């Protein structure tokens, strides 16, 4: 289909941008939904379902909890001196030794998990006048009665249990973690049978702290054939400090210390299988990619992970505003420029030209403006990731029953942080999308203005993104306009001459209306004059008589 007013002495050049039949809706500051040619999802909403063992060292706890592995439960001996970046506790983990409790369980678990090692150093404690290496049928090691391998159960020797007073200095340059305990017999008879005294006492001190525990004698629910309990305590001895242990009974003594390390190690409860793969980010649901800035898989993470948000989807515009091409038009229609719609089928660029001249029609992309837009958009995703990825882990928070209010406060703080980040993510993406659309629109306008400045008076802006060129412009001429080498002076005289000739025949639509109305008014006036003259002539000849009655 020819463009209006086109012939061999003129040409038409239209500027346009890429469009797709079905774009993607994104949110901007000014619009909740605006269609763009392309967008990237920013929220990771699914996991692989498995925990990758690379680059992080993953230690599968299997049927052992971290504390059981720490104490040396017989069925956890395989974990002695192990190290990890992430210790994975399973839901089927169980204890299989003398029943115990840890009054500050969460703190001990977190301390050991962050240390990332169960490296144990045996020390030569001297326990005089007592029997060492006590055991229980509740803690079988093979066919024999046993006990926690990292603890030493001290009982009476003969009929005496002397007061124990032992010191152990820390002459090294690292922190030492000592695990010790207090036995709570189920009856008074058990108390005297094991420790002679009717009531024991255990005091463990350093220069910075002191703990004194008095056993609580009494029956408790039976667990693995035992109604007594052991309470587990722990003490950290700094370099240059001294550990002092004083007791007259009921002491579960340390055999040595755990070497403490500082680092980013952690612990996570998960039943996801561990597999040979690579992933920087781990959640209880499994590993997730960290190529997106946000995720809503799980609040608990380890490694370099996307920020957790509430949204299921946030789309970042990576293309321009999409205005699908009207399908009723061909390559050239009544309106072919970017003002009304985009162009589908532009596979080699975002912006381009369509022309019609004496040699036919054609289309070509403008790579300069396309590259300028792409360069500004390409770094957006990486910049958003850099702003949001956490280079640390979000650990599980655990509190005892007496710390219920602290737990509620912690939950409130975490929920508030998530709400804040979810809002920030929404605003951040909306701002980036607004910028993308504005800059792609700007590149289109720059290309149009650059073309208009080249053509000057040799062409007329048709108001729809097209120029009517008033001189013969073959394909070489069109190419010179596209690449910026067009010389308007060469065609100036021809363009002016053709413009005057065409304007002598063509009338712009605005003047046509005025002329039509004026012509209609003059015609009506002349018709009235002729009709009135005929009536007056007829009256004079007597052919018409007029009677006026009052």
Curated annotation (Swiss-Prot):
It is found in: Virion membrane; Host apical cell membrane. Keywords: Clathrin- and caveolin-independent endocytosis of virus by host, Clathrin-mediated endocytosis of virus by host, Disulfide bond, Fusion of virus membrane with host endosomal membrane, Fusion of virus membrane with host membrane, Glycoprotein, Hemagglutinin, Host cell membrane, Host membrane, Host-virus interaction, Lipoprotein, Membrane, Palmitate, Transmembrane, Transmembrane helix, Viral attachment to host cell, Viral envelope protein, Viral penetration into host cytoplasm, Virion, Virus endocytosis by host, Virus entry into host cell. It is a single-pass type I membrane protein. Palmitoylated. In natural infection, inactive HA is matured into HA1 and HA2 outside the cell by one or more trypsin-like, arginine-specific endoprotease secreted by the bronchial epithelial cells. One identified protease that may be involved in this process is secreted in lungs by club cells. Residues 1-514 are extracellular. Disulfide bonds join 14-466, 52-277, 64-76, 97-139, 281-305, 473-477. The chain crosses the membrane at residues 515-535. Residues 536-550 are cytoplasmic. Pfam families: Hemagglutinin (PF00509). GO terms for cellular component: host cell plasma membrane; membrane; viral envelope; virion membrane. Homotrimer of disulfide-linked HA1-HA2. Belongs to the influenza viruses hemagglutinin family. Major glycoprotein, comprises over 80% of the envelope proteins present in virus particle. Binds to sialic acid-containing receptors on the cell surface, bringing about the attachment of the virus particle to the cell. This attachment induces virion internalization either through clathrin-dependent endocytosis or through clathrin- and caveolin-independent pathway. Plays a major role in the determination of host range restriction and virulence. Class I viral fusion protein. Responsible for penetration of the virus into the cell cytoplasm by mediating the fusion of the membrane of the endocytosed virus particle with the endosomal membrane. This is Hemagglutinin. It comes from Influenza A virus (strain A/Duck/Hokkaido/10/1985 H3N8).
């Amino acid at each position: 289909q020819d463009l209006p007013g086109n012939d061999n002495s003129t040409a038409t050049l239209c500027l346009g941008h890429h469009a797709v039949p079905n774009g993607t809706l994104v949110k901007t500051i000014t619009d909740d939904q605006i269609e763009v040619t392309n967008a990237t999802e920013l929220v990771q909403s699914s996991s692989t379902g498995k925990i990758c063992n690379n680059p992080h060292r993953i230690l599968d706890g299997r049927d052992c909890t971290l504390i059981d592995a720490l104490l040396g439960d017989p069925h956890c001996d395989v974990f002695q001196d192990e190290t990890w970046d992430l210790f994975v506790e399973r839901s089927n983990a169980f204890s299989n030794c003398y029943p115990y409790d840890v009054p500050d369980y969460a703190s001990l678990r977190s301390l050991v998990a962050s240390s990332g090692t169960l490296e144990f150093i045996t020390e030569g404690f001297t326990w005089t006048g007592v029997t060492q290496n006590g055991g229980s049928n509740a803690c079988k090691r093979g066919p024999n009665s046993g006990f926690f391998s990292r603890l030493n159960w001290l009982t009476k020797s003969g009929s005496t249990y002397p007061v124990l007073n032992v010191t152990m200095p820390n002459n090294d340059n690292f922190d030492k973690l000592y695990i010790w305990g207090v036995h709570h017999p189920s009856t008074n008879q058990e108390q005297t049978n094991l420790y002679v005294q009717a009531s024991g006492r255990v005091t463990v001190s350093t220069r910075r702290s002191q703990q004194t525990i008095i056993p609580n004698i009494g029956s408790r629910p039976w667990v693995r054939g035992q109604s007594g309990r052991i309470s587990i305590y722990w003490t950290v001895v700094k370099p240059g400090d001294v550990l002092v242990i004083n007791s007259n009974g009921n002491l579960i003594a340390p055999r040595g210390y755990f070497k403490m390390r500082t680092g980013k190690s952690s612990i996570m409860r998960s039943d996801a299988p561990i597999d040979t793969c690579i992933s920087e980010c781990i959640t209880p649901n499994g590993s997730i990619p960290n190529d997106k800035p946000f995720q809503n898989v799980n609040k608990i993470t380890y490694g370099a992970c996307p920020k957790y948000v509430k949204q299921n989807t946030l789309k970042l515009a990576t293309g321009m505003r999409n205005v699908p091409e009207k399908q009723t038009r061909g390559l050239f229609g009544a309106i072919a420029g970017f003002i009304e719609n985009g162009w589908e089928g532009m596979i080699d660029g975002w912006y381009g030209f369509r022309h019609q001249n004496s040699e036919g029609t054609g289309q070509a992309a403008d790579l300069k403006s396309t590259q300028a837009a792409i360069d500004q958009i390409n770094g957006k995703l990486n910049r958003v990731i850099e702003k949001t990825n956490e280079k640390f882990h979000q650990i599980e928070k655990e509190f005892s029953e007496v710390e219920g209010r602290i737990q509620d406060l912690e939950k409130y703080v975490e929920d508030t942080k998530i709400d804040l980040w979810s809002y920030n993510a929404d605003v951040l993406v909306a701002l980036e999308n607004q910028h993308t659309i504005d800059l792609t629109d700007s590149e289109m306008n720059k290309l149009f203005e650059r073309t208009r400045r080249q053509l000057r008076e040799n062409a007329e802006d048709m108001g729809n993104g097209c120029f009517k060129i008033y001189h013969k412009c073959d394909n070489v001429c069109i190419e010179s306009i596209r690449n910026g080498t067009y010389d308007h002076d060469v065609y100036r005289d021809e363009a002016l001459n053709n413009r005057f000739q065409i304007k002598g025949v063509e009338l712009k639509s605005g003047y046509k209306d005025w002329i039509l109305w004026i012509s209609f008014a003059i015609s009506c006036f002349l018709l009235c004059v002729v009709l009135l003259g005929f009536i007056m002539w007829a009256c004079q000849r007597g052919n018409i008589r007029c009677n006026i009655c009052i």
